[in-house]
Amino acid sequence: NNQQSLEGRFHKLIEAIKFVYSSLFFRDSRDYFRIIGKDVRNERMAIIIQEVVGNRYGDNFYPLISGVGRSYNHYPTQKAKREDGVVNLALGLGKTIVDGGWSWIYCPAYPKSPPPYKSIREILNSSQTSYWTVKMGHIPEFNPISEIEFMEKSPLEKAEKDGTLR
């Protein structure tokens, strides 16, 4: 986060942890558990805290690339098997991937395989058009239920101006 003091950063970290745990009881979460036939009270969770590595560009901070790897690929293409896994890569924070946004996808067992698209037009229509950053400027007013209080979604043109798409 962009708090000036270590104490302020610590308090924002504690708020974020509380938000993650309480999110289990949000309506969307309860609806999801009802749909899959599980009792939300039996759910277990853990929190991993990791440093975001990147650079500051004006009032925004973001990594050039973030990724999510999964050991199981529900939609393998060409020679890939489900057990080969899948990787998604995106510019900026991993929220793009986690939220199901457009990202580059490939199978680690076959990294040179062509993408599973039939045309250049299909590739362009399935490409990332925005990215998430950490806002480093003005500290926003506290919002206990906002997951994006310190984040900003920007169009790729902004990253191009930052010089990160070369």
State where each predicted segment sits:
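Conserved mixed alpha/beta core segments that line enzyme active sites in large multi-domain catalysts
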Residues: N1-R166
